[in-house]
From Swiss-Prot:
It is found in: Cytoplasm. The keyword DNA-binding applies. Homotetramer. Forms an RuvA(8)-RuvB(12)-Holliday junction (HJ) complex. HJ DNA is sandwiched between 2 RuvA tetramers; dsDNA enters through RuvA and exits via RuvB. An RuvB hexamer assembles on each DNA strand where it exits the tetramer. Each RuvB hexamer is contacted by two RuvA subunits (via domain III) on 2 adjacent RuvB subunits; this complex drives branch migration. In the full resolvosome a probable DNA-RuvA(4)-RuvB(12)-RuvC(2) complex forms which resolves the HJ. This is Holliday junction branch migration complex subunit RuvA. The gene is ruvA. GO terms for cellular component: cytoplasm; Holliday junction helicase complex; Holliday junction resolvase complex. Has three domains with a flexible linker between the domains II and III and assumes an 'L' shape. Domain III is highly mobile and contacts RuvB. GO terms for biological process: DNA recombination; DNA repair. Residues 65-143 are annotated as: Domain II. Belongs to the RuvA family. It comes from Neisseria meningitidis serogroup C (strain 053442). GO terms for molecular function: ATP binding; four-way junction DNA binding; four-way junction helicase activity.
């Protein structure tokens, strides 16, 4: 099992990244929360990972924190939620926001994540209740990397999460100018939930 990778970030192409660890390039899918908190290409990075072996593929998923990985592991245990859907959920909300939504039984908020309908959201509440803990302080490992055009990056992230261009552009209007991309995505998603 590959539990953690430490090396040089050599490629960033949402939602995939490549980390060079002693001459071996590891390709991993990451949540948008993690992606926008990665350092620039060429810098050192550390990710917690989850390797999923299927009949047709070996898939590696990367996370900024051990807590995010733990949440991912709980999500993929829920019936109807696969690895890609779990990653989409963690792109739409932080692990703490997910834990809070489950604790509050907020089906509407959960079903706003891409690929999650009302029934799956209800199943998430039932199966995850008591298993996720919200933390008031998150332990991010990376400094936020400023984007050249944050608005475009936020819109493209929302499009990657399955929202329409109209919804994405409307949601970005409520994000204050100068907000970094990671925080901008969170604020835009909150605007979409209103």
């Amino acid at each position: 099992m590959i539990s953690r990778l430490t090396g040089k970030l050599v490629e960033k192409n949402p939602p995939q990244i490549v980390i060079d660890v002693n001459g071996v390039g590891y390709e991993a899918d990451v949540s948008m929360q993690t992606f926008y908190n990665l350092p620039p290409v060429g810098e050192s990075v550390q990710l917690f990972t989850q390797l999923i072996i299927r009949e047709d593929a070996h898939l590696l998923f990367g996370f900024a924190t051990a807590e995010e990985r733990k949440t991912f592991r709980q999500l993929i245990k829920v019936g109807g939620i696969g690895a890609k859907t779990a990653l989409g959920i963690l792109s739409a909300m932080t692990a703490d926001e997910l834990a809070q939504a489950v604790a509050e039984e907020d089906v509407k908020r959960l079903s706003s994540a891409p690929g999650i309908g009302k029934k799956t959201a209800e199943r998430m509440v039932l199966e995850l209740r008591g298993k996720l803990v919200a933390h008031t302080v998150t332990d991010g490992l990376f400094a936020a990397a400023p984007a050249a055009d944050e608005t475009e990056d936020i819109v493209s992230t929302l499009l990657a999460l399955g929202y329409s261009e109209r919804e994405a552009k409307a949601a970005v209007k409520g994000v204050p100018e100068g907000t970094d991309v990671g925080e901008g995505v969170r604020l835009a998603l909150k605007n979409l939930l209103k």
